[in-house]
């Protein structure tokens, strides 16, 4: 027998203690992973617009979210942890795309607030989009929205609000409705979401995501605008390689072209 085997057979009590310590350490590490919390997320996106008629364009975006309190992942799908924890946050995004004949720069800041010790929810956003082209005056459009929501059961949000815009050519404000529901269907977690705005031109969107496990989702989406050939069909997927690092992709199939998007993000 080897020295290692002799040590094992002649020191059973010591070996037993070591195995117990190893089991305890493994369980402790697992509990750390389950209870991991984060308080911010930053992401970067690249998008390729491939129109049916015209040249391909590329756009870029940066986004960030700061949560007022650490988000506890628990046993939730990683992508839905903040929503299921009702985590209030500040968020923002800036994007740029060059269509050759003109450029579009946009930014947006928002606040999501889950009112403590209640089932009510508030959401507000304001942003601006700038269109720039040679030989013409820049067009700046301010876009804003506000919502009041209610969560009647865990995982379900129903919200109503207003969506408006204002630029040199006009302004408008339309009422909106939105719902989001994260629940378990059979052995899988699923996300269902939908929204609509009502005005001179109605718009609506629907989407669903299937979580194959807590780190991986695949989903479908559809959006359309009343009175225009503006329907968009979306295929999307997202994967968390760790509890901090994620990568997601989407393809939008539209009437006049396709958009391919890829986003990487980091939580801390």
Sequence positions of predicted segments:
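Outer-membrane beta-barrel proteins
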Residues: 4-26, 30-268
């Amino acid at each position: 027998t080897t020295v290692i085997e002799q040590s094992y057979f002649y020191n059973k009590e010591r070996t037993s203690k070591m195995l117990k310590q190893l089991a305890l350490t493994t369980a402790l590490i697992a509990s750390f992973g389950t209870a991991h919390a984060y308080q911010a997320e930053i992401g970067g996106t690249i998008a390729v617009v491939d129109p049916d008629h015209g040249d391909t364009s590329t756009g870029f975006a940066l986004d960030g979210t700061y949560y007022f309190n650490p988000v506890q992942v628990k046993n939730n799908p990683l992508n839905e942890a903040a929503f299921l924890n009702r985590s209030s946050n500040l968020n923002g995004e800036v994007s740029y795309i060059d269509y050759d004949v003109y450029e579009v720069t946009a930014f947006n800041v928002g606040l999501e607030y889950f009112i403590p010790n209640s089932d009510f929810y508030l959401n507000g956003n304001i942003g601006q989009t700038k269109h720039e082209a040679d030989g013409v005056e820049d067009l700046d459009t301010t876009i804003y929205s506000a919502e009041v929501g209610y969560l009647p059961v865990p995982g379900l949000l129903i919200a109503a609000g207003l969506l408006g815009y204002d630029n040199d050519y006009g302004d408008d404000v339309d009422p909106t409705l939105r719902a989001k529901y994260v629940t378990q269907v059979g052995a899988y977690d699923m996300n269902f979401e939908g929204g609509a705005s009502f005005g001179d031109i109605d718009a609506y969107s629907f989407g669903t995501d299937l979580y194959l496990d807590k780190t991986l989702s695949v989903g479908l989406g559809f959006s359309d605008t009343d009175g225009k050939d503006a329907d968009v069909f979306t295929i999307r997927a997202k994967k968390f390689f760790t509890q901090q690092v994620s990568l997601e992709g989407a393809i939008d199939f539209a009437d006049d072209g396709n958009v391919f998007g890829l986003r990487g993000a980091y939580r801390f």
